[in-house]
């Protein structure tokens, strides 16, 4: 059986370093995701129509902003208030439950976006996939609303189960004097809440994996077609395939890392009481939304154009300042 040495507390320097890293990850994630939100929101203010991909990215970035805030609260709660020798505080469990719910919403949005990529990029030869792809393109906004509604229902059920179960556990603990038995009940309650909240992630995970697999197969078929034909140096279809797969694979990697870190943090919290290990897990969870937002920006033509414009404006301002500093010396 795997045993770890309990680390009930960590040094003051480790706490400061952990909080500093958490604030840096929070700042990077907020700037990256807020940039995506502001660019698309500004287009809406200028009454420029947003395409389906922009709308999905806007919703995904708003969810990521909420995730980053929850993870910062999680880090502060762990470093400053949660003692490993004590039972998990209700606030800490509530923050983790909200994080799992928000993470599930982001998974639904990514699944919808992967379906949109399939509908726009993959060239189907059979009738049913063609009709399905056409339906996804025409009804994407309705599909997105249904996904958000379903994830909202799952979130409401998860929160209702968590708070009602927590109330039941607190009531039973007040009527029982067996401290060890009460702790075991609370651990089982938190583990059950974790499992229950992630049951709703199964359907979007299947949709995401199937659509990603279809894109990979389509890319392989396209590469074989290119080998048998003489094509120019630039292939828009190949570029679209590669950009979509980079987005999907990066999201999958970040999601798996984040989910595994959250899963590992549970036994570290309730069984092994290893505070240092939990800090590492939370740091990994916080790095995922900001890292994926950076990949989204680097692969989106509109967002890259805005960044280039901002950099050009900043360089122009710097040149103007230098000129104003040099002119008084000349005169």
UniProtKB/Swiss-Prot annotation:
Q: Which GO terms describe its cellular component?
A: membrane; plasma membrane
**Is Zinc given among the entry's keywords?**
no
Q: Which GO terms describe its biological process?
A: detection of chemical stimulus involved in sensory perception of bitter taste
List the subcellular locations: Membrane
Q: What residue range is the signal peptide?
A: none
Q: Does the keyword Glycoprotein feature in the UniProt annotation?
A: yes
Q: Which UniProt keywords apply?
A: G-protein coupled receptor, Glycoprotein, Membrane, Receptor, Sensory transduction, Taste, Transducer, Transmembrane, Transmembrane helix
Cysteine disulfide partners in this protein: none
**GO terms, molecular function:** bitter taste receptor activity; G protein-coupled receptor activity
Where does the UniProt entry place glycosylation sites? Answer: 177
Cite the InterPro entries for this sequence.
TAS2R, TAS2R38
Q: What does the entry state regarding organ or tissue expression? A: Expressed in tongue, stomach and duodenum.
Topology term for the membrane: Multi-pass membrane protein
Note, other: Several bitter taste receptors are expressed in a single taste receptor cell.
Query: What is the annotated role of this protein in its UniProt record?
Result: Putative taste receptor which may play a role in the perception of bitterness.
This protein is called what? Answer: Taste receptor type 2 member 38
Q: Which organism is it from?
A: Rattus norvegicus
């Amino acid at each position: 059986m795997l045993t770890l040495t309990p680390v009930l507390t960590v040094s003051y320097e480790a706490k400061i370093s952990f909080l500093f890293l958490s604030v840096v990850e929070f700042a990077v994630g907020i700037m990256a995701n807020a940039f995506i939100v502001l660019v698309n929101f500004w287009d809406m203010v200028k009454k420029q129509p947003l395409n389906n991909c922009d709308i999905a990215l806007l919703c995904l970035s708003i969810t990521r902003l909420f995730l980053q805030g929850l993870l910062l609260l999680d880090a502060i709660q762990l470093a400053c208030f949660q003692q490993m020798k004590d039972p998990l505080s209700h606030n800490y469990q509530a923050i983790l439950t909200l994080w799992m719910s928000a993470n599930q919403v982001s998974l639904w949005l990514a699944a919808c976006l992967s379906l949109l990529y399939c509908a726009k990029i993959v060239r189907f030869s059979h009738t049913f996939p063609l009709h399905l792809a056409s339906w996804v393109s025409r009804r994407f906004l309705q599909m997105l609303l249904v996904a958000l509604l379903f994830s909202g229902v799952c979130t409401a059920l998860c929160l209702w189960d968590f708070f009602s179960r927590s109330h039941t556990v607190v009531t039973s603990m007040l009527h029982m004097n067996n401290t060890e038995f009460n702790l075991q009940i609370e651990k089982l309650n938190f583990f059950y809440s974790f499992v229950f909240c992630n049951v709703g992630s199964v359907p979007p995970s299947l949709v995401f994996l199937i659509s990603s697999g279809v894109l990979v197969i389509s890319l392989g078929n396209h590469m074989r077609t290119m080998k048998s034909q003489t094509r120019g140096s630039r292939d828009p279809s190949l570029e679209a395939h590669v950009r979509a797969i980079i987005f999907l694979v990066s999201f999958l990697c970040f999601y798996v890392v984040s989910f595994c870190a959250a899963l590992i943090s549970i036994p570290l919290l309730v069984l092994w009481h290893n505070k240092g290990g939990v800090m590492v897990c939370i740091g990994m969870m916080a790095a995922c939304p900001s890292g994926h937002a950076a990949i989204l920006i680097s692969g989106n033509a509109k967002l890259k154009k805005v960044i280039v414009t901002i950099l050009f404006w900043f360089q122009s301002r710097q040149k103007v300042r230098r000129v104003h500093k040099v002119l008084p010396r000349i005169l």
